[in-house]
Amino acid sequence: MTADSNGYVGFDLALFIAEKLRAQFVFDMAQMEENTATYPQVETIVCGTSVAGLSVSETRQIDNINRGWQALIEDLRLKRFQINKLVTIEYNKLVSESENRLGFGGFRNAPVAIGGTSYTPPTHLDLNSCWDELIARCQELEDNPLEQSLLLYAEMARNQFFGDGNKRTALLMMNGNLIQNGLCPITITKSREVEYRTALNGYYESPEQHRIQFFDFLKQEQQTMLKRWGYEIQDVSKSAPVITVK
């Protein structure tokens, strides 16, 4: 049994991975937001039970991220996931409730800045045109859903469409498109945070120059997930690695 270099595993297995590892995905996303919850605490919250030892805001953040994943999985199961503005806004409302104060329920209504980089996101007045441009670029990649998904994540993070929760929303949208196309979902782990932020900040400042570096990082995280599910990556050629199941 083999999968191509895009991480194709089929829709059913891709969705099963997201369902089975939902607590892990929620935990990873929360950790990247500097949430101090442990994995057992996150798993308990995901299962619907309250835990002690966390602040109200940390507990709420975990619950919000979990609701975002629940909504995505349900949309995928019912075949209603789409890359559009309405879906994106709905996911952002779920993951950023009580955190987004710059136009909650829509695109942000004020300028924002990003720490650690000299890059300045587009003004809020240009966000609709930026979104339309992103959709057009995604449509050009219909035949390459992996690249399409990675571009969606990168540009949603770079444009900062929302007042908060941008990367969380982008991760949901990226994974929705991956899973919908039968590709293995991606989670970004805290252990690789420095590599992630270095690659992402490079993309912020010079997308064309750092696109390969950032996309390769995301592909490596996908390969890590594939290996976790028993897939072995064999470099048959430099341009077309083949992934096989043990």
Write out the residue ranges for each language-model feature.
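FIC/Doc superfamily catalytic core
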Residues: 1-246
